[in-house]
Structures are given as C-alpha cells and as structure tokens.
Amino acid sequence: MTAEPNKPCQIKRDYQQLINLYPATADTDAHYLSKLSIYQQRVFEAHSQQKLLILGQIGLGNGLELLSWWRTQANPSQRLLLKVFEPNPINAYELKSLWDQSLALVKETPFEPHLESKQASALECKPELSQLAQTLLDAEPTAIIGCQRLIFDDGRTTIDLHFGDIQTQLSSLSHSPMHPVQHWLILPHLLQALHHQSHWQMAKLSDDSATIATIGLSESSGLSETTVKRFQACGFTVSDINELATKALGINALGIHQPVTLINHQPDAVLLHERQVLRQQDVKAYAFNPMAAILSSATPSSIAIIGGGLASAHLALSLAERGQGAQVFCKDAELGQGASGNRQGAIYPLLTPENDELSRFFQQAFLFSRRRVQALTSAPAVNQTSISHDFCGVLQTAHDERSQLRLDKIIQGQPWPSEIAYAVDAEQANAIAKINLDKPGFFYPLGGWVCPFEYADAAIQKAMQLADVSVSLNTDILAIERQADGWVLLTEKERFGPFAQLVLANGAELTQFDASNKLQISPFRGQVSHVPAQFQLSQLATVLCANGYLTPSHQGLHCLGASYVKEPEHLDFCPQEQQENLMKMHESYPDHSWLEDIDMSGNNARVGVRMVTRDHFPMMGCAPDVPKILKDYEQHQLTKESRHYWQTTPAPLHQGLYILGGLGSRGLSSGPLAAECLAAQLCGEPIPLDKETLCKLNPNRMWLRKLLKGKAL
C-alpha cells in the first residue's frame, strides 16, 4: 500500500492555473479527437514496416494527444516510443485534477466532413481513453526536471516525459542514428514559444525525412506563414491536422482526391548537411564517452551476461522487451545470492542540496524502479515469483548535529516536489511511523521496501517469457577471452561462446577478470541484522533511515542495518557488527521504549558485499581499456593539446565488453534504469538520460575526468 502523500501539497495550482499551463488543443472543435485519431492512424500506416517507431511531441497540453497516440497504436509487431517535451512539470495528482474538472475524457461524434455536424454528448465517458489515463496515473509521473521513462504492455509502448525548458531538454539528447524521431506533433500553444535553436535541435534528433504536424495553422495565415518558414528552414515539411484529416478521408470539397503527406521525400541537401554538422559536433564533444556498439542481430547467442543479481536480471528484461535474447551465467544455485540477497531493501532517491546530476539521476532511477515493481506485480509472467514489497514510504531523520545540518541543507536547498519528499515535524513523523520518534524528518511518500532477490527472479521470469533468454545456474565463469569472432567464457571444465557482446554484471566479482581488474571501484561488506517483530516494534509502518535503517516487519522479521566495512577479509557472521547495528538505532532514536523490543539474541543476520564508486554513480557502459589509456597518457599529458586530444578522441575500450555494476547500497533504486539505458545503447535506441549524466555513468570516468582537466593520473 503506497504511503499517503501530503495531498494538500501535491496540488499546488488551482484549476485555472492548470488549464492555462496545459490547455486543451481544440476545445471548440467537437470533432477534434476524431481528426486527431485519423491523422495518427496515417502516421502509423506511413511507418508500418518499422519495428520501432519513434515519435516526438512538443507540449503535453491536457494529455489527450498522448493518450490518443497510445490508443491508436494497433500493430502488435511494432513498438512505440513517444517522447513528450513539456516545459512545465506536472504530477499525477494535478493531471487527474485537470482531467476530472475539464471533462477531457468525454465522448464525441465521429468526424464526417460531408455530413452536417452532430452534437457531441459531453458527459458520456470515453472508456478506451479513460482506461489508458488511469494506467498513466498509476505510473505516478512526478513534477521533476528531466526524463521519466514509462514502459507499458511489456515494452510495446514507452513514453518518455521530458519536463523542463524545451531547448535544454532537446539539446541534452544525442541523435540516435538507427532509431531517430520519425514524426513530430507540436501543440499550438507552444508553436511561437519554440526558439529557432529548438527547431534545429529537433532536426538533429530527427530522421532526414521526418515531418511536423500541428493544429490550426490554416486559421491564422500570419502564424501559418511564419511558422512554416521557420521549420522549412530546418528541412521539415509542416502540415495541419485539420487538413490532413480531411485529405485522409479521400476527397476535398471539389471532389478531388488529396494525398496525405507524412513523409518528406525531398529534403534539401544543404539543410540535411547542416543537421549532420550538428550531430557531428555532438559526437566530437562527447568522443571521450564512447557508446555501445549496436547489436547487428537478434540471435540467441549474440549477448552474454555474467551475474545473477538485480543488474543482470533487469538487463535481460530490458533486452527482452526489445525482442533481444541473452544468456545469463550465474555462479550460484539460485539468483540473487550476492548483494541482491537481502530480505528487504529500502527504495528511495538520493537527493543533494544542489539537485545535481547525481540527485536528478536517482530521482529518475527510483521512479523507474518503482514502476518496474508495479508492472511485474500487476502483469506477472506465468508461474512468476511474487515480489514482496510495500511502498509504505521512507522517513529520513538525523542522528547527530552534523547529519541534521546536512538534512536541513537538502530540505531547504530545493523546492522539492512533495511526491518526491517533504519535511515533517515530530508529531507528523510519529504518525507516519506509528511508533514514537519525537524528531522531525524528510518523508519520501513513494518510497518503501522491496525484496531484492524476488525482484531479480521476477524480472528474469518475465524476460524468459518475452524473448529467448536462458539462465545457466551453478556456472562460475573464471576467465573471459577476446577472440576474432567475439568473447569466449571459460569455467573449470566448459567453454561458452563466442558472444558478440558480453556484459559484466557480476556484483562483487566485477573486477575478477583481467579486462576489468583496474576499475576504480571498492567492495564494502554489509551485515544486515534480522530481528523478530514484537510489541511496539511490530507497529513500525514505514522504513526508517537515520544512522542505519530499520524496515517494517516482513514474515515476522525486521531488517536492521547495515555495517559498512571496506575490502572485507571474510563474509562470516560478525557479533560486533550485529551490536553496532543495534547501537546505531539507539544513537538515532535515544531513550525510546520500542528500542528495547529489538532482540539480537538470535544472531540472525545476512552478510553481503556491495561494490561502491567514489562518486556514488553506478558504472554503465563500455569497458575501458585501462592499459591503453595509460599508454596513450604517456604521449598526451599535462598540456593544452593533451586536453584537446582526450576531449575529441574516442577513449580506448574493450570491443564488445560492457560494465553494469557499482550499484552500492542503493541498487534497488539505480539498477533497473542503468540496465534499461545499457539495453537501449546496445539496441541503438534513444536513451532516457542526458549526455552529461551518461558521462557520469561511464566506467572510464575516473581517468577521463582528470585527463580532460589536464591533470596527472
């Protein structure tokens, strides 16, 4: 059960403010939705041979266009990725308020231009749109800056919500050569607001034959002329949906057949060259951050994943949603026996006072992971493991003066959307926790806890249902070798491969191979204590996070943890760490009677190792060839020219080898989105992260960060 958000804070804008920011496109046209549907059908027909159709939309409006795209998609063998750019972030609560009060989801009569208009029935419900609207609301879009990826129907429909300044959002994305944007819909209230630079950024992201459609151009000849010229100057053909819908029905007022133009067949060569220059500028500016080599086939043996935890399971799932098979190698008898083996793990975002790339990434990642849990729970695979979880919220409190100052900086640093987190006083904290804490805190209403190994197992089961995904248990890969035709995996007795692509997602063993042993990442031991649910303690109703964490009960036990020991010598049970976990709770909430209910006498605990990076970002991307980096460094160091060299030269890497790890203690939040981004890279699809954040995830970043500044390694 999701924790009850602070609803008065959720809807900060009244209805009049909402309709001003998110206006209905054609509320005076009783047939608008029918016209929109006809136009959208023609878009899908024009690109019916593509397995993945990428569409762009400028403006969310009242959401009707988004829902109609979703409803109109009818080809079961085609996937849709719809990228919506909206300057004003909105959350699910405000979106529902907008729909409820505007009656946006109402039935209308079909558009029939040869017949007299019929009166629409304004109060009849549109069940087909209402159902999709509820599905969208259940995904809990939040009012954060950046991209939120929403995946529906086992990957058949994906919606990227890009909130924030449109020019900033467009320019932050890279062109996807294999899967560019094929068509744009621009809502009329944003036509004049788009900067000329935004037009070119749209062109950069588009297929060379991509077109633009909008609504109501013919109603304002001045707007029509200036708008069309702007976009034509970037190589686009611009059409009006009203005219397209009439033409699509075949005959105009004079009885003459009118073809529907949805593909720009003769773009200007000079303008196309200018687009290509923009793309090359991007490539050159981020040459130090090489992308994955795109998979050339979907054969079952094309990709191997080493690891049996959350990272490997979610990579397999993200690949499977794209129809891509994979073979997963796990050294244990069951999945999720490493860092993913805990009974309960907290899921909530890592926030910083500055809301920097780290903070924004973790908000996106946390929300993505939360939606994954919901999707795997609501539409499980056949015989799928159920995922024990409870989105009961996470309550963060301070445990000393220093941590209080840090928490205050976070709370006061940004106007955080209250669906992400909001401050509570001591009385509110007690009410949320259902036990006495008697101190203020920061509450994450959408957070909670998830069972990691069940989460991993459910993801694998779903992946195996969707594509040719296999899992080899009890298979300890001891060495990997690069050969002319791919990567070969070796155990004591067996040999697997070759594989065109190999992903190392093996948690604590991430650095065990020659090709990965130089990664700048450290193992940290963590002992989680399991204590019986009894007396006052059993009433705990949210995850507590202070000096350590404490979960609500699950199957009669609470999880209390965790120790944090760098480069551990062993993974045996440690009585001292057990007592340290208890003392952390006493330091966090001193002199409270419920602390006496924490019974450690059973010495019940689990020990695991999490791999941690210094900057707290996961590692995701091409495996760096560190010896080659160091060799090149001998020739290019500590000069202005050397900085230019490292900036514009693709960094050395191991061809076909990728890293997915370093999830640290927040892998439940960060792992699924990191896996989704790597799957998108491997398949040549748009990635739901901006270019700067991708650089922060790159496994080579520790070396390149210094080299780009002209510093010594």
UniProtKB/Swiss-Prot annotation:
Key words of the record: Cytoplasm, FAD, Flavoprotein, Methyltransferase, Multifunctional enzyme, Oxidoreductase, S-adenosyl-L-methionine, Transferase, tRNA processing
Annotated stretches, region: FAD-dependent cmnm(5)s(2)U34 oxidoreductase: 306-713
Catalytic activity reported: 5-aminomethyl-2-thiouridine(34) in tRNA + S-adenosyl-L-methionine = 5-methylaminomethyl-2-thiouridine(34) in tRNA + S-adenosyl-L-homocysteine + H(+)
Domain of life of the source: Bacteria
Record GO cellular component, one term: cytoplasm
Cited PANTHER family: SARCOSINE DEHYDROGENASE-RELATED, TRNA 5-METHYLAMINOMETHYL-2-THIOURIDINE BIOSYNTHESIS BIFUNCTIONAL PROTEIN MNMC
InterPro entries in the record: FAD-dep_OxRdtase, FAD/NAD-bd_sf, SAM-dependent_MTases_sf, tRNA_MAMT_biosynth_bifunc_MnmC, tRNA_S-uridine_synth_MnmC_C
HAMAP family: MnmC
Family: In the N-terminal section; belongs to the methyltransferase superfamily. tRNA (mnm(5)s(2)U34)-methyltransferase family.
Species of provenance: Shewanella baltica (strain OS155 / ATCC BAA-1091)
EC annotation from Swiss-Prot or TrEMBL: 2.1.1.61, 1.5.-.-
Subcellular location per the Swiss-Prot or TrEMBL entry: Cytoplasm
Primary location class: cytoplasm
Name listed for the protein in its UniProt record: tRNA 5-methylaminomethyl-2-thiouridine biosynthesis bifunctional protein MnmC
GO molecular function, one term: tRNA (5-methylaminomethyl-2-thiouridylate)(34)-methyltransferase activity
GO-annotated biological processes: methylation; tRNA wobble uridine modification
Classification via Pfam families: DAO (PF01266)
SUPFAM superfamilies: FAD/NAD(P)-binding domain
Primary role: Catalyzes the last two steps in the biosynthesis of 5-methylaminomethyl-2-thiouridine (mnm(5)s(2)U) at the wobble position (U34) in tRNA. Catalyzes the FAD-dependent demodification of cmnm(5)s(2)U34 to nm(5)s(2)U34, followed by the transfer of a methyl group from S-adenosyl-L-methionine to nm(5)s(2)U34, to form mnm(5)s(2)U34.
Required cofactor(s): FAD
Annotated spans, tRNA (mnm(5)s(2)U34)-methyltransferase: 1-300
